[in-house]
């Protein structure tokens, strides 16, 4: 005879550290997320990106509400995703550095500006997406930003994808 679910008072609630480590066991791709507002480029490393829909084509990104990127992407209404390959690890490290200067942060990152949105896109990314924001959903300490894809490009010479797993960058090799 099976027992029912345990009484809620008998269960331990997960703590933030355990949750973070458990999520670290889920391998994700690594991307550069960009936006541009008031003639200033904003960029950050993001692994919390996924497709939402094919018709219409939608992507989502999760953005920390306390970070400077949050208000910029909401103000701009458009953003770009560049999918990183293994040689882009220095870019991923740089754009994940808290407190880096806003002005000139893309000076060391070879990029161009998207034709549809004007956001910075990595020159040799595995693929790029330009998006226009269609919805923003508050979600705890982050916002889920949903965007309609208005442009897609793919590298003619795809390389090894950069992954993030157990708090480290990895590749499939």
Q: PLM ranges: what are they?
A:
Residues 1-173:
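Basic, polyanion-binding surface patches
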